[in-house]
């Protein structure tokens, strides 16, 4: 196994680890929700509010870990393509060497900065075989068409007998807390869309 393949393995491992962290935060969110119910039943609204804040924080953290997992996974796919095509540049190899400690830290800010460096390397990467790139992007596209995502979400909601309410205008989501959370999510979604456009 070459050094580059080891680093590629570490990238894929980090994506899985981030995904595990996301699931852990999901569990924490559920635990906090259970505590909210207990506190409300006891009439202790102050404690309930603290658990509600914790639940929202865990939910946002779960989403952040999941987004970063997807981003690292996408970069791993790009590195795999570069390795396969023999197009790993010296500067890209340098970025890859510096990543091991960053990925182990599970620090989202540091990992995000590292992914920025990777994405910059791919922007400057001169792809020799455009036809191969086109073929690969058709089979393993990194950017998912939004309408397909929406259709799948709707399909899953229909199967579960739920109403997605995707057409609801912002601000009609109910309480102030949820509209703030949705505003944060909208901002994250916009940032992710901008990142996709850069890739």
UniProtKB/Swiss-Prot annotation:
Residues 167-199 are annotated as: Disordered. It holds the Pfam family Snf7. The keyword Iron-sulfur does not apply. It comes from the Eukaryota. The keyword Protein transport applies. One of its GO terms (cellular component) is multivesicular body. It is a peripheral membrane protein. Keywords: Coiled coil, Cytoplasm, Endosome, Membrane, Protein transport, Transport. A motif (MIT-interacting motif) lies at residues 186-196. InterPro entries: Snf7_fam (IPR005024). Residues 170-182 have a biased composition (Polar residues). Residues 10-48, 178-199 form a coiled coil. GO terms for biological process: endosome transport via multivesicular body sorting pathway; late endosome to vacuole transport; protein transport. It is found in: Cytoplasm, Cytosol; Endosome; Late endosome membrane. Belongs to the SNF7 family. Probable peripherally associated component of the endosomal sorting required for transport complex III (ESCRT-III) which is involved in multivesicular bodies (MVBs) formation and sorting of endosomal cargo proteins into MVBs. MVBs contain intraluminal vesicles (ILVs) that are generated by invagination and scission from the limiting membrane of the endosome and mostly are delivered to lysosomes enabling degradation of membrane proteins, such as stimulated growth factor receptors, lysosomal enzymes and lipids. PANTHER family: CHARGED MULTIVESICULAR BODY PROTEIN. Probable peripherally associated component of the endosomal sorting required for transport complex III (ESCRT-III). This is Charged multivesicular body protein 1b.
